[in-house]
Regions:
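Membrane-embedded catalytic scaffold of the fatty acid hydroxylase/desaturase
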Residues: 2-211
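Cytosolic-facing loops and C-terminal tails of multi-pass membrane proteins
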Residues: 197, 207-248
Length: 248
């Protein structure tokens, strides 16, 4: 839990592979091949420390949005991500309740994108810290809204709670009779709700819904009561989603 809260997976992985990539990029420069730095697209403007930090923050938030949608759309990834959504009582620690493999996959993609974009190590650490700080706040069990306009600029606890709502955050259309629920969900944005607005996944309703996963309530499915049982059951669901084992 503490490892996730501090973003240590991403930070350690970033600094672990940086020497290897520095060597590789050095070889490319020797061969006359340039390297890409996103903050260099407008010299004198985008390469300033604050401007580049803002650019990278927006880019990585978009990456987070895409990853978050994948966690819900792909059954094998949802099998792991469900650990995060299975907590019925939202708290600031809910953000840190994850399957370890889910965290590792997320970190690997983040670091891969960071290295491709050429972000400075100090800015990578800053973006990880900013993201973790606000994610913790968004999971707090408080009725906090930023108002009509503020909700469309920055993700609030109310906006994110709808993402955790039973039959809403993971399902675009709820189950009706014998008709199964349609996966899709709402409010995947991590810091910025812009992406949800752009891609039609935003829900700005002022409801304060119960949180969790539908089959916890309707079928009593067990997602684990402690860390080790959550990890074990997550791997079991993953194997089933990949067709490697049968449901029992």
């Amino acid at each position: 839990t503490l490892i996730h809260r501090l973003g240590l997976f991403r930070v350690v992985l970033f600094f672990s592979i940086e020497p290897l990539l520095d060597t590789l990029l050095g070889e490319l420069r020797v061969r006359g091949l340039g390297t890409f730095h996103l903050d260099g697209i407008w010299p004198g403007v985008t390469d300033g420390p604050w401007a580049s930090l803002l650019i990278y923050l927006i880019v990585f938030d978009f990456v987070n949005y895409l990853l978050h949608r994948a966690q819900h759309q792909w059954n094998w990834w949802w099998a792991l991500h469900a650990v995060h959504h299975a907590q019925r009582q939202m708290t600031q620690w809910t953000d840190n309740r994850n399957h370890v493999l889910d965290d590792v996959l997320h970190a690997v993609i983040w670091v891969g994108v960071a290295q491709m974009l050429g972000i400075a190590p100090s800015q990578f650490v800053a973006i990880v810290a900013i993201t973790q700080l606000f994610e913790n706040f968004q999971h707090a069990n408080v009725r906090v809204s930023f108002g009509t306009w503020g909700e469309r600029l920055w993700v609030s606890p109310r906006f994110h709670r709808l993402h955790h709502a039973i039959g809403l955050g993971h399902e675009r259309h709820p189950k009706e009779g014998d008709k199964p629920a349609v996966l899709g969900g709402h409010n995947f944005g991590v810091l910025l709700p812009w992406w949800d607005v752009m891609f039609g996944t935003a829900n700005f309703d002022h409801h304060f819904e119960a949180t969790g996963i539908r089959d916890q309530v309707e079928e009593g499915r067990d997602y684990g009561k402690g860390f080790w049982s959550q990890q074990r059951l997550g791997m079991k669901r993953l194997m089933q989603a990949l067709g490697l084992t049968s449901a029992s």
